[in-house]
Amino acid sequence: MKGQETRGFQSEVKQLLHLMIHSLYSNKEIFLRELISNASDAADKLRFRALSSPDLYEGDGDLRVRVSFDKDKRTLTIADNGIGMTRDEVIDHLGTIAKSGTKAFLESMGSDQAKDSQLIGQFGVGFYSAFIVADKVTVRTRAAGVSADEAVFWESEGEGEYTVADISKADRGTEITLHLREGEDEFLNDWRVRSIISKYSDHIALPVEIETREEKDGETIVSWEKINKAQALWTRSKGEVSDDEYKAFYKHIAHDFTDPLTWSHNRVEGKQEYTSLLYIPSQAPWDMWNRDHKHGLKLYVQRVFIMDDAEQFMPNYLRFVRGLIDSNDLPLNVSREILQDSSITRNLRSALTKRVLQMLEKLAKDDAEKYQTFWKQFGLVLKEGPAEDSANQEAIAKLLRFASTHTDSAAQTVSLADYVSRMKEGQEKIYYITADSYAAAKSSPHLELLRKKGIEVLLLSDRIDEWMMSYLTEFDGKAFQSVAKADESLEKLADEVDESAKEAEKALEPFVERVKTLLGDRVKEVRLTHRLTDTPAIVTTDNDEMSTQMAKLFAAAGQAVPEVKYIFELNPDHQLVKRTADTQDEAQFKEWVELLLDQALFAERGTLEDPNQFIRRMNQLLVS
């Protein structure tokens, strides 16, 4: 063979092969699904390229994948007449993994085989799955549009290296031959191979054929029998497609091992004509938070595959949705640039977004347990929605779930509709608090009065929550109110103050002035409050000022953070406040005020500028 060379696998490939062979062995038959799926993709790519270059078909436009086996040689071969590969493409696709974040993904793998199996399945094993059942894999391929002597040979035993060389191949496409390991004879059984193809590949539009041999008049006659329906699943009516077929098709397009949570199959006619098949996965992809994570729908135009990962049809906060759209209105030569500026795309995006939100609303209504699975996997992503999509903000708000003082659990199970249904008579606002953790939110002194009054508070502790709430201003006509803000509605909740208490407060006015003078412009204001029951003091911000949590978000993003000026609120009924007010010695008075302020700031921010000074001051006051 000409141009033969032996090359080493990229280190990640070696690691993936090892993990895959051991983790996926219990579900080893999926290798055939993966290889047929790749062949289907190769046919799709050829059809697309041939739209502008019909000569790529080379007079052979009947695309198919063929499966054959040789019991004597113990080989199984999967051959297609799709797009094929050049030498450079073979090295890129079969010698390396081009996915960003692969190294981090592999490092995250543990020793739990069931968990590893799910993770690797999520990653998408594709071609490498052949090594689950084969101890050697041989590939012969010729790219469409090149001469017969520009074909490529690739071979590996799945260890540390592979061989690549130039060969001659008359027909276009890729032929993969698996040299089966000892003990894998089931894949040389005609009935077994047929049943696997029927199970996993019935929905593929590409005909999958199996070799049949018949002895006639002393001659062996070879023919090819189509095994699958070979009709694009989404073109069939919903009543014709079983749940198992929908699930199998999802696994084909998503390269996922797990069943989807739900799906929606719709054909729309009228002003715009299109078919959509949208799926909600049951688990998040391993690289969902990776900047380079590819997402979007498969795009077909008049049943011709155009592109993968067409992100223009789904907003970013729904990037977990998998599926396809088949449009009759877009041109066959559509590009990503044309999609970006097309009014057809914008209309389709709007319709598909509404479809997904309706699908999720139905899931939440019909199966709370499944919806909770969805929320645990994708809730953080959905929380990006109120900021990104003001047109659908109300629909998104219905889908949000929160922890709450009502459930006394960190689990985010409470909907806004649940909250509103439990609002007290005369309660006009939906109260919430944001914090760094559920524990910090739950124990915040800002909740004291509301707990006493039996008023529910939503406990928000995800990093995105403060940002989300800056866009989400009301639900069902009820305004949202942060309990960490200085708001009249919170003061009004306090019991009516009797005359003697009013007189006591009046007597504390000089004390409040002393505190103001001492603290100067370090705080925005000093005042007495009736919002507290057990805590001597808190700090709050005005409704129109940046909150503590938002300031933390800015800082984490490396942005300049404007100074937050707090309102210092003191509980006139607390013994520490009374003791401070009675202190005449100015030095002692200063220490007590500083201690109260530090306590309030620490409760609000979780940190202090000078914690050592705080400890020194507290120790000194404890022994004085």
Swiss-Prot record:
GO MF: ATP binding; ATP hydrolysis activity; ATP-dependent protein folding chaperone; unfolded protein binding
Protein name: Chaperone protein HtpG
Region (B): 337-552
Region feature A, mapped onto this chain: 1-336
Record's GO cellular component terms: cytoplasm
Annotated disulfide bonds: none
Cellular localisation: Cytoplasm
Function recorded in the entry: Molecular chaperone. Has ATPase activity.
Gene name per UniProt: htpG
Assembly notes: Homodimer.
PANTHER family from the UniProt entry: HEAT SHOCK PROTEIN 90 FAMILY MEMBER
Keywords (A to Z) from UniProt: ATP-binding, Chaperone, Cytoplasm, Nucleotide-binding, Stress response
Metal-binding recorded as keyword: no
Region of interest called C, as start-end residue ranges on this chain: 553-624
Primary location group: cytoplasm
Family per similarity comment: Belongs to the heat shock protein 90 family.
